[in-house]
């Protein structure tokens, strides 16, 4: 049979399908028989962009392939059209084997738009980071900074360029601490005219407790180490600092150890990073260490709680949940990143948190720019491209085995601002769950 005849037959088959089948056909299949100019073409992101999200826990790099179009019935209101579209999406056979908790809220009208199993307890994966981010901003404020401080005790002897005393490096669990900040510490010591230290280099680890991993983390995951002193996101700070001092001609007689700095210690320098800068990478790249660091900033409450624990953070999150009019005992908060298998939230909780953030400009104006943008950046860079949802949906993704989630904001076709949460559990293929979520977003945007 000639190619032209095959093409004609396939097109006839496609056009003969029921409307719902036409709407939800996979574009990879449609592209086989559409004219060449209509094929879906995808491009590989450059190496720099890939590196920028190298710590991403959304490990599935599969590109979207859903070709979605929706009719608009002029005899129905916008809300009735949206409800009809969403009801059709929820006829998907996917939901025969996969759980879905969904809530969609119209922020402009401050009314419920759609809900489905919104109170079903589900594992959120990395949309847990939305909970952590909003709780941290609510408790600490948008001007909060992560700190790493250097102190000394004893006497400075100018004639011998000696510190007759000790150095203390006080950790604040700053995940952005890199070589630039390390060099600043060394330069500050040199500026004091110190080339020799008769005492000890102490690491003050009192910012948090000694637990290095979160509850419910799988042993075979790429788990971050939870330490107050981080260098290049690793637990190698003191060794690297000691080495850097030696390289710059600064010697220490008694090596290094751990001890909390005394109240009479003198500050040499403090390096800082803003909560907004940390949050941007945490959300765009879905960085688990950054999220756990923010979880412990919340737990520490700006340094008020020494040896802060995950339970301290949970208490503050529970307080926020009560402010939303919900019962915190209905949820399980294990960690700040969503890595834990013990986290159980609902779509309702996530939406009410996003609504709360929107109603508080200090939170919303810091949170919104950190969210991945559909078809543009972060973990949404390959999703919903060439659709009305592209450059519109700003949302946090979540992916662990069996779980895919999406929560954030979008502007609907009627100009209304929407917040939403979609949590899928029990799926063997994350791509199918992502496409389900994409269709919901496109239905709202188109």
Task: Enumerate the predicted regions with their spans.
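Extracytoplasmic
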Residues: 97-99, 117-119, 125-128, 143-145, ...
């Amino acid at each position: 049979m000639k190619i032209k005849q095959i093409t004609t037959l396939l097109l006839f088959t496609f056009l003969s399908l029921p409307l719902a089948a036409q709407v939800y056909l996979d574009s990879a299949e449609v592209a086989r028989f559409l004219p060449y100019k209509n094929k879906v073409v995808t491009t590989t992101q450059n190496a720099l962009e890939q590196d920028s999200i190298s710590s991403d826990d959304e490990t599935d790099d599969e590109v979207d392939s859903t070709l979605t179009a929706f009719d608009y019935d002029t005899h129905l209101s916008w809300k009735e059209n949206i409800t009809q579209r969403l009801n059709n999406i929820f006829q998907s056979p996917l939901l025969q084997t996969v759980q879905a908790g969904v809530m969609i809220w119209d922020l402009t009208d401050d009314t419920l738009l759609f809900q489905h199993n919104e109170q079903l307890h589900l594992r959120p994966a990395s949309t847990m980071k939305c909970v952590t981010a909003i709780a941290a901003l609510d408790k600490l404020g948008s001007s909060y900074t992560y700190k790493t401080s250097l102190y000394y005790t004893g006497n400075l002897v100018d004639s011998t360029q000696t510190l007759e005393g000790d150095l203390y490096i006080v950790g604040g669990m700053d995940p952005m601490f890199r070589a630039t900040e390390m060099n600043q510490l060394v330069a500050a010591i040199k500026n004091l005219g110190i080339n020799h230290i008769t005492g000890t280099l102490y690491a003050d680890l009192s910012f948090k407790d000694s637990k290095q991993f979160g509850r419910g983390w799988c042993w075979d995951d790429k788990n971050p180490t939870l330490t107050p002193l981080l260098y290049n996101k690793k637990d190698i700070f003191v060794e690297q600092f000691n080495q850097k001092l030696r390289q710059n001609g600064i010697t220490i007689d008694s090596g290094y150890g751990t001890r909390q700095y005394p109240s009479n210690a003198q500050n040499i320098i403090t390096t800082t990073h803003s909560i907004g800068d940390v949050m941007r990478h945490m959300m765009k790249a879905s960085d688990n260490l950054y999220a756990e660091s923010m979880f412990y900033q919340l737990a520490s409450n700006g340094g008020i709680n020494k040896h802060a624990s995950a339970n301290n953070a949970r208490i503050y999150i529970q307080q926020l949940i009560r402010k939303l009019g919900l019962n915190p005992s209905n949820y399980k908060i294990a960690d700040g990143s969503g890595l834990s298998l013990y986290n159980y939230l609902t779509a309702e909780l996530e939406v009410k948190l996003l609504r709360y953030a929107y109603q508080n400009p200090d939170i919303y104006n810091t949170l919104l720019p950190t969210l991945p943008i559909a078809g543009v950046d972060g973990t949404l860079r390959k999703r919903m491209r060439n659709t009305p949802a592209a450059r519109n949906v700003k949302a946090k993704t979540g992916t662990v085995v069996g779980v895919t989630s999406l929560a954030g904001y979008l502007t609907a076709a009627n100009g209304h601002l929407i917040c939403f949460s979609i949590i899928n559990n029990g799926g063997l293929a994350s791509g199918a769950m992502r496409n389900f979520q994409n269709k919901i977003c496109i239905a709202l945007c188109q």
